[in-house]
């Protein structure tokens, strides 16, 4: 018997998350904020095509079960990162391509009656912004990075558990369960272009993770 499950993170920038020098690019109309993603994730590829988010990590996996034991397991799913469009009003605009990082997938761990999967995907957005740094020159032009690490446990009885175990310092990471329902909202940082020394956020309940059940 094959059991399949998935967990998805969507990362986006709300209007209240950008402050300081970088806010001018958004308020001028050259850049755009993101509308909140839907509460129910029906078609991730279509949301990506329409530019509704900056980044998504979809961890999908399967486990083959025989006599109550997991005998084989594997991954599906992928990461999505959107282009960045800079508008020049009536003169048009320019679309900048992001840089995708290699997908990091741990080998499925088979533990008798369950299997554990872990996936990290992300990238660097297409347009650099001024970011404050310690010491001279006090600002650097750097494109923000965005990534999440998701974990999925599939059990032989057909149940599963999903976790957001770590994430980059990006304003919003929303987590969707196997059925596409919004399961958690993580506000990791108010400004994606803030202090470069804040490399990651670890949020949630016990152990610093966001955990929910399927």
Regions found by a protein language model. Name each.
Residues 177:
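Short, acidic, Ser/Thr-enriched surface-loop or helix-capping motifs
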Residues 168-170:
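Short, small/polar residue-rich loop motifs at catalytic or cofactor-binding pockets
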Residues 1-68, 74-156:
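Solvent-exposed helix/loop surface patches that form functional interfaces
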Residues 196-214:
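Cyclic nucleotide-binding regulatory module and flanking cytosolic helices
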Residues 185-187:
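Beta-strand-dense domains in secreted/periplasmic systems and polymorphic toxin scaffolds
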Residues 72-76, 160-165:
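Short beta-strand segments that buttress and anchor functional surface loops
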Residues 173-174:
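A residue-level detector for well-ordered beta-strand positions
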């Amino acid at each position: 018997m094959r059991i399949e499950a998935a967990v998805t993170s969507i990362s986006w920038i709300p209007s209240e998350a950008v402050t300081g020098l970088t806010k001018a690019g958004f308020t001028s109309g050259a850049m755009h904020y993101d509308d909140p993603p839907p509460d129910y994730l029906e078609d991730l590829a279509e949301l990506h095509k329409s530019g509704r988010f900056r980044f998504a990590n979809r961890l999908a996996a399967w486990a083959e079960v025989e006599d109550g034991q997991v005998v084989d397991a594997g991954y599906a799913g992928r990461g999505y990162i959107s282009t960045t469009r800079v508008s020049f009003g009536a003169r048009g605009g320019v679309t900048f391509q992001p840089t995708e990082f290699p997908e990091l997938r741990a080998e499925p761990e088979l533990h008798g009656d369950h299997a554990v999967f872990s996936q990290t995907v992300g990238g660097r957005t297409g347009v650099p912004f001024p970011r404050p740094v310690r010491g001279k020159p006090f600002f650097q032009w750097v494109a923000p990075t965005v990534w999440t690490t998701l974990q999925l446990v599939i059990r032989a009885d057909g149940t599963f558990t999903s976790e957001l175990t770590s994430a980059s310092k990006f304003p919003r990471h929303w987590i969707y369960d196997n059925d596409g329902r919004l399961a958690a909202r993580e506000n990791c940082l108010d400004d994606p272009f803030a202090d470069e020394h804040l490399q990651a956020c670890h949020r949630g309940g016990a152990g610093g993770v966001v955990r929910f059940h399927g």
